[in-house]
């Protein structure tokens, strides 16, 4: 039996047990919490159709309504997210670093919900989180700042030093402002009236 198949069988069984353990939380909070996530293969991060097919298989294989399938927030992942949400599959979007990609992912969630509702689906049973990474941005930016600091004047050095460790939080604040704008829109309020859950922002390290 291929190693990949063995891994998936073990992962599915493990996730089923975790989902069962948390299902009382899921029931008590009416689907607002109590989820377990299982990710599609990272090798499919640039493959829209492959991501959709694997997410569908994992969703069916686990067979628990408190599962979220992890899908990376790549350009190819965005249409997969839209398609999967429109099919009633809850999604945990991972590896979000930029405001632009976050905005695209949030739009994919909303348009997927609209399609699901238009087909007669109940949006209350769909949940999603957007995992927006913080510290990794500062690591990358601070390294670039260090390179610049080594080659500028003393006055400029002080200015650049003051920027270290701050870019990621500023980036996250702007993403949150976009989130607030979207959930305050008439478009979103129409979905809320039908019971839709917001796509929660998850601040990741």
For each feature predicted by the language model, list its residue ranges.
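Active-site beta->alpha loop and helix N-cap motifs at the rims of alpha/beta catalytic domains
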Residues: 1-80
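A broadly conserved amphipathic alpha-helix scaffold signal in soluble, globular proteins
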Residues: 20, 56, 82, 103, ...
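Short, well-ordered coil/turn segments that N-cap beta-strands
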Residues: 30-36, 63-67, 87-89, 124-128, ...
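Glycine-enriched alpha-helix->loop->beta-strand junction motifs that scaffold or abut catalytic
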Residues: 80-91
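Catalytic alpha/beta core domains of metabolic enzymes, predominantly
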Residues: 90-205
